[in-house]
């Protein structure tokens, strides 16, 4: 999947996460979280795993975490990535 435009998913409410995805020449992940010292590596690993499953190798991803659970983070990354592409989504692969 190729990222072709800027897209956002999520909110800045407590227990949620806002994920911003935009075109970039390589994979760049920025994590802003109050719990980054404890969970920063896990947050980055989850983002990388979701992007790999979607076949994304070049994008800038900015994560503004407010204490979201892992499943919420996965859903927000998927939603932002799908909004940021013009490609037809293969729903069987996504689910």
Curated annotation (Swiss-Prot):
Disulfide bonds: none annotated. It is found in: Cytoplasm. GO terms for cellular component: cytoplasm. Keywords: Cytoplasm, Phosphoprotein. It holds the Pfam family ACP. Coiled coil: none annotated. InterPro entries: CitD, Mal_deCO2ase/Cit_lyase_ACP. The modification O-(phosphoribosyl dephospho-coenzyme A)serine is found at residue 14. Oligomer with a subunit composition of (alpha,beta,gamma)6. Covalent carrier of the coenzyme of citrate lyase. Belongs to the CitD family. This is Citrate lyase acyl carrier protein. It comes from Haemophilus influenzae (strain 86-028NP). The gene is citD.
């Amino acid at each position: 999947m190729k990222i072709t435009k800027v897209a956002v998913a999520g909110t800045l409410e407590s227990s949620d996460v806002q994920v911003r995805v935009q075109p970039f020449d390589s994979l760049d992940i920025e994590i802003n979280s109050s719990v980054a010292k404890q969970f920063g590596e896990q947050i980055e690993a989850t983002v990388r795993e979701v992007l790999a499953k979607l076949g994304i190798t070049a994008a800038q991803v900015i994560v503004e975490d407010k204490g979201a659970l892992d499943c919420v983070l996965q859903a927000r990354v998927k939603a932002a990535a799908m909004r940021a592409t013009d490609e037809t989504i293969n729903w069987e692969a996504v689910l």
